Each structure stands twice: as C-alpha cells, then as structure tokens.
C-alpha cells in the first residue's frame, strides 16, 4: 500500500503549486490534488500543475474539488442549475484527466440537518449513474466519499446506493468523517468495502470525558492496523492519503513525521510485505 499526501493538508500553509514540489522533495510517490476554487480549474493553471507534478515525479491518483462550489447543484431539480454544475464538473474531470487522476472524490448533496429537499435515494441514484458515466468518458472513476454533513453519512446509505446502482459507484473512505458521523470507519468497510478505491487518513482519540480529539495519522489511538487488515480482506489494492485540516499541525515537517508513522503502521498490517 502506497501512502501519499493530499494537497488539501497544505491548505493556507502552502499554495498547491508550491506544495507539489515540497511533496516531491520528500520522495512521496503519490498524491491527491485538491482544487480549491474555480481559477484552479482553468487549463493554464492545470497545465502548470501537470508540469510541476512531472518534474517532481509524483503520480496523481485522485482529484478532489471544493465540493460546495457546485456539487449540490448537480442534483438540482432546476435544469439551468444542473447544466451549469455539470459544466463545472466536466471542467474538473478535464483537469483530472490532464493530471493523470484515476478517481474523482465527490461529496454529493448536503443534508444540512434535514433542510434539503429532493435528495431521496431513489431520485438521486440515477443522477449518480449519469455522473459516473460522464466521468468514465474522461477515464476517471467517480467515488462518493462518506461525509458527516452529506448524503453518505451512514454506512447503510452506501449499501443501499450499491444495490440501486449495481456497483457502478465506488467510494472514498474518510476516517475523520466516519468518526464525525458517529461510526467506526470499519463500519463503512463492512458495508461497502468491495467498492472502496481510495482512503483518507486522519487519527482520532476518544477522550475520557467524552468526545473525540482528531490527530495527525499515527499521533492518536485509532487502530489503523485492524482497519488496514479489514480493507485487505475486502480486496483493497489502492493507496491511502494523509488528508487533515491544516490547523491540526504547526509545521510542515509534522506532515512527513505522520507519513513515516503511517508507513510503520502499514508494515504491521496485511500490507506489510508490499513496498510503499
């Protein structure tokens, strides 16, 4: 299992075009590119990123846009809203294709405490299918990420979506968001593990007085060995990315200490005989 970094972990610490050379300088073989805003979808900007990625010898596995900028409107009942959102979606897919990404990480519709209408699974499952087909035209697999405030916040939702879409939709497992939703990440693996193709890592420690402290991967108490072993049982063969909020660490070297600790954890799991 390769352990990489998401450029999202550099948010407000370093711009994406500067984060890429930094990742390469540390010998990290693979990354997830987080595109922050519309200007970063522009072909000239994407081309500059592609050149820097090539110079740094970094593989891009996945692309992840700032979801709330357009993804909820992909599921809108208003045709113009949806058409404009699809145009933006396809701009990101085009960017992902140029960067060599294999996967698109999607949040999908927000729940917003039940205040959003028209997100019944029977209505949106065909939309997911359409979006997956559009992504495939760019050579990219659509993956729906579990997110505490979006439609896929409970493991059962993923299982129901799979039943309705015949396995066409794959998933990104996000450890932090699983815990925020009140679940163990392994609950999602049990529900949709055969369809997980991407993993976001963050650590979590249960506090004696209740609540959770989120940590850099390898700095907390989450049982990653068991999680990796369960992924292995489900046939997972992809990478995993350190994807944390940038206010969780003070200095960039902490990212690489975290990466080193995660590689050590991986070596104690079923993936331990692989090179990474």
Predicted segments, located by residue:
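N-terminal pre-domain/capping segments
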Residues: 1-97, 166, 170, 194, ...
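Short acidic/His/Gly/Ser-rich catalytic and metal-binding motifs that mark active-site loops
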Residues: 69-72, 113, 205-210
């Amino acid at each position: 299992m390769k352990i990489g970094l998401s450029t999202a972990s550099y948010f407000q610490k370093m711009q994406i075009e500067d984060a890429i050379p930094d990742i390469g300088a540390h010998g990290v073989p693979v990354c997830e590119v987080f595109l922050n805003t519309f200007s970063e979808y522009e072909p000239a900007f994407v081309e500059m990123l592609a050149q820097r990625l090539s110079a740094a010898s970094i593989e891009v596995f996945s692309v992840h846009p700032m979801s709330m900028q357009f993804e909820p409107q992909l599921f809108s009942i208003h045709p113009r809203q949806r058409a404009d959102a699809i145009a933006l979606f396809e701009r990101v897919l085009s960017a992902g294709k140029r960067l060599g990404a294999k996967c698109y990480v999607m949040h999908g519709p927000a729940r917003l405490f039940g205040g959003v209408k028209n997100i019944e699974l029977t209505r949106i499952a065909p939309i997911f299918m359409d979006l997956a087909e559009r992504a495939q035209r760019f050579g990219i697999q659509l993956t729906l990420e579990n997110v505490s405030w979006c439609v896929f916040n409970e493991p059962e939702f993923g299982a129901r979506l799979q039943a309705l879409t015949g396995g066409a939709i794959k998933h990104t497992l996000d450890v932090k968001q699983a815990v925020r939703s009140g679940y163990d990440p392994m609950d999602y693996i049990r529900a949709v593990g055969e369809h997980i193709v991407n993993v976001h890592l963050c650590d979590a420690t249960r506090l004696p007085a209740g609540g959770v402290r989120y940590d850099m991967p390898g700095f907390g108490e989450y049982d990653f060995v068991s999680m990796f072993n369960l992924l292995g049982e489900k046939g997972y063969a992809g990478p995993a990315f350190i994807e944390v909020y940038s206010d969780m660490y003070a200095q960039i070297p902490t990212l690489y200490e975290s990466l080193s600790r995660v590689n050590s954890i991986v070596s104690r799991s079923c993936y331990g005989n692989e090179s990474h």
